[in-house]
A protein has these predicted regions:
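PRPP-associated nucleotide enzymes
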Residues: 14-186
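Single conserved hydrophobic/aromatic residue that forms the stacking wall/gate
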Residues: 1-12
Length: 186
């Protein structure tokens, strides 16, 4: 029996699934809205406005999940009726949204709506077609950073191919002393 492309993809998918199951820092989000948004974004017949709307929905869901471990602070606020004890994102931390140019920009507007206190730090790389290695051409990440343990970074890049650009982006922040546990790829 000859093997078709479907068999190759199936084997590769099973292998990738095993690798993903071994990762304890990988979160796969599955729900109907995520699936519908991905379907809309991938459909060649979707117009630009449709892609943007689907990306906004997807960004919101992904960031809600990605930010659930941000440090919080207990505060007391005054409501129209009484005082109320609650929690808020710790104002002593620095949140960075770091889109990898250009594809990562599609997540930026929604990310800033969700995290208005975040700073945007663009990073730009392209893939050398011969070596498949990333080549830097733009970096707006400050050097050095004070109190790197108080930084929380969300790297946005929907166009994952080899993963080398994402690895380089993570390395950029780790080299500044930011703990890997404080870096999330969306």
């Amino acid at each position: 029996r000859s093997r078709g492309l479907g068999d190759v993809y199936k084997r590769q998918s099973i292998k990738e699934e095993r690798v993903m199951m071994e990762q304890n820092n990988l979160k796969i989000i599955t729900n109907p809205i995520v699936n519908q948004s991905l379907c809309t974004m991938r459909n060649k017949n979707t117009d630009t406005e449709g892609v943007r709307l689907a990306a906004r929905k997807l960004t919101r869901i992904l960031l809600y999940e990605a930010t659930k471990n941000l440090p919080q602070k207990d505060i007391e606020i005054e409501t129209p009726l009484t005082k109320f004890k609650t929690k808020t994102i710790n104002p002593d931390i620095t949140i960075i949204i770091s889109p990898i140019l250009r594809a990562g920009l599609i997540f930026t507007d929604e990310a800033v709506d969700i995290l208005p206190q975040a700073t945007i730090r663009h990073i730009g790389m392209y893939r050398d077609e011969k070596t498949l290695k990333p080549v830097w051409y733009y970096n707006k990440v400050p050097m050095p950073v004070d109190n790197p343990e108080n930084y929380y970074v969300y790297i946005t890049d929907p166009m994952l191919a080899t993963g080398n650009s994402l690895i380089e982006a993570i390395r950029l922040y780790v080299d500044k002393g930011i703990p890997e546990t404080n870096i999330c790829c969306v």
